[in-house]
């Protein structure tokens, strides 16, 4: 059995986010001035979280956010950011570069509605979920294999970095509203994983956890939080326990969904659907 902390962060704002234009995979837009401020803010919020693995989408808005987070980090040493195409945003095909309002019109003409509508050349929700599933199962295997290797070498969990509650400070000690932050507890994990990805992708990841893995939100977290797209640099944090006997059926504890208190001093709109 192995346990790991999973922190998922959405990239900072881009000009396309601000103007409500679809980016998907074909528009590789860098962060805006506000986006860099958001990335720095989330980096400062996570500065005392110890990460053993860092993964990011290979699109520039995610890369820049991941770099800002790690530049602010004080206790994660010699961690290489791994860029993975499986963490990319949903592909919107012909709708990329167009306003979200046009996507809704396209969906209506096709007798469908967002977000289930797939524009020509775009990815279906099932395809996005398949990417999320593939990457999550990869993470579970990775942590299991590393944990097993350390145990066999008699180093134990401490050989993997000894990630304890003290290394996950903001998620253990930070006092948030009940709707945002679930009850946390003292925990020691074999690994602490940071993922930097995208809004629609993260939304489908959480739907995969809920619908495919039968993950349930704790009472103190409103289930409605599952549905909205995360604000830019919103944070979701989970504790995942995976068994070698049933590696595809991990136990998942949710600590927070779409947390964005670090943006309180930044002039950015977090209320609308940002894609």
UniProtKB/Swiss-Prot annotation:
Record keywords: Apoptosis, Autophagy, Cytoplasm, Hydrolase, Mitochondrion, Nucleus
Cystine pairings recorded for this chain: none
This protein's record includes keyword Cytoplasm: yes
InterPro entries: His_Pase_superF_clade-1 (IPR013078), His_PPase_superfam (IPR029033), PG/BPGM_mutase_AS (IPR001345), Phosphoglycerate_Mutase (IPR051695)
Main localization (coarse): cytoplasm
GO molecular function: fructose-2,6-bisphosphate 2-phosphatase activity
Signal peptide: none
GO cellular component annotations of the record: cytoplasm; mitochondrial outer membrane; mitochondrion; nucleus
Pfam family, one: His_Phos_1
Active site: 11, 89
Listed EC numbers: 3.1.3.46
Key word Mitochondrion present: yes
Reactions catalysed, as given in the entry: beta-D-fructose 2,6-bisphosphate + H2O = beta-D-fructose 6-phosphate + phosphate
Enzyme class: hydrolase
Localization (cell): Cytoplasm; Nucleus; Mitochondrion
Site positions per UniProt: Transition state stabilizer: 198
GO BP of this protein: apoptotic process; autophagy
Family per similarity comment: Belongs to the phosphoglycerate mutase family.
Functional summary from the UniProt entry: Fructose-bisphosphatase hydrolyzing fructose-2,6-bisphosphate as well as fructose-1,6-bisphosphate. Acts as a negative regulator of glycolysis by lowering intracellular levels of fructose-2,6-bisphosphate in a p53/TP53-dependent manner, resulting in the pentose phosphate pathway (PPP) activation and NADPH production. Contributes to the generation of reduced glutathione to cause a decrease in intracellular reactive oxygen species (ROS) content, correlating with its ability to protect cells from oxidative or metabolic stress-induced cell death. May play a role in mitophagy inhibition.
Name this protein carries in UniProt: Fructose-2,6-bisphosphatase TIGAR
Organism: Xenopus tropicalis
Gene from which the chain derives: tigar
């Amino acid at each position: 059995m192995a346990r790991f902390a999973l922190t998922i962060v959405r990239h900072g704002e881009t000009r396309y986010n601000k103007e409500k234009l679809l980016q998907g995979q074909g528009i590789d837009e860098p962060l805006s001035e506000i986006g860099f401020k958001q990335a720095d803010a989330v980096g400062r919020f996570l500065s005392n979280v110890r990460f053993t693995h860092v993964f990011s989408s290979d699109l520039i808005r995610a890369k820049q956010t991941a770099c800002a987070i790690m530049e602010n980090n004080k206790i994660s040493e010699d961690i290489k950011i791994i860029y993975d195409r499986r963490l990319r945003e949903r592909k919107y095909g012909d709708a990329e570069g167009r306003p979200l309002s046009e996507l809704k019109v396209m969906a209506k003409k096709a007798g469908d509605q967002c977000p289930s509508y797939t524009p020509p050349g775009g990815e279906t929700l099932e395809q996005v979920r398949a990417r999320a599933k593939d990457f999550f199962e990869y993470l579970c295997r990775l942590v299991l294999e590393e944990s097993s290797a350390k145990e066999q070498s008699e180093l134990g969990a401490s050989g993997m970095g000894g990630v304890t509650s003290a290394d996950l400070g903001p998620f253990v000690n930070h006092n948030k509203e009940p709707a945002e932050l679930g009850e946390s507890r003292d925990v020691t994990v074999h690994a602490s994983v940071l993922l930097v990805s995208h809004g629609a992708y993260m939304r489908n990841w959480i739907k995969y956890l809920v619908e495919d893995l039968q993950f349930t939100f704790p009472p103190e977290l409103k289930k409605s939080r599952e549905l909205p797209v995360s604000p830019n640099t919103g944070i979701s944090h989970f504790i995942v326990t995976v068994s070698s006997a049933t590696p595809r059926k991990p136990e998942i504890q949710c600590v927070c969904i779409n947390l964005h208190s670090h943006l309180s001093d930044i002039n950015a709109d977090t209320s609308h659907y940002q894609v």
